[in-house]
Amino acid sequence: EACEELRFGGQAQVPTLVDSVYQQFLAPGAARWINIDSRTMEWTLEGLRQPHRYVLDAAQLHIYML
């Protein structure tokens, strides 16, 4: 749901939403931590440098494929 909100939300909200999703689900010690493989995490972390609405797509796909 968070990734869908990011994808279809306003462009001005993208950096805030990306950071929020990262902190909540992917950051070390996150409250609702989700384990993704190292390659997907690497791509995601690279994308966080210049966040865009599709930066979390690889992580979302990885989670769906589990």
UniProtKB/Swiss-Prot annotation:
InterPro entries: RGS, RGS6/7/9/11, RGS_sf, RGS_subdomain_2
GO molecular function, one term: G-protein beta-subunit binding
GO biological process, one term: regulation of G protein-coupled receptor signaling pathway
Start and end residues of each RGS domain: 1-66
Keywords per UniProt: Signal transduction inhibitor
GO cellular component: cell tip; dendrite; dendrite terminus; protein-containing complex
Keyword set includes Nuclease: no
Source domain of life: Eukaryota
Job of this protein: Inhibits signal transduction by increasing the GTPase activity of G protein alpha subunits thereby driving them into their inactive GDP-bound form.
Assembly notes: Heterodimer with Gbeta5. Interacts with RGS7BP, leading to regulate the subcellular location of the heterodimer formed with Gbeta5.
Name recorded for this polypeptide: Regulator of G-protein signaling 11
Species: Rattus norvegicus
Recorded name of the encoding gene: Rgs11
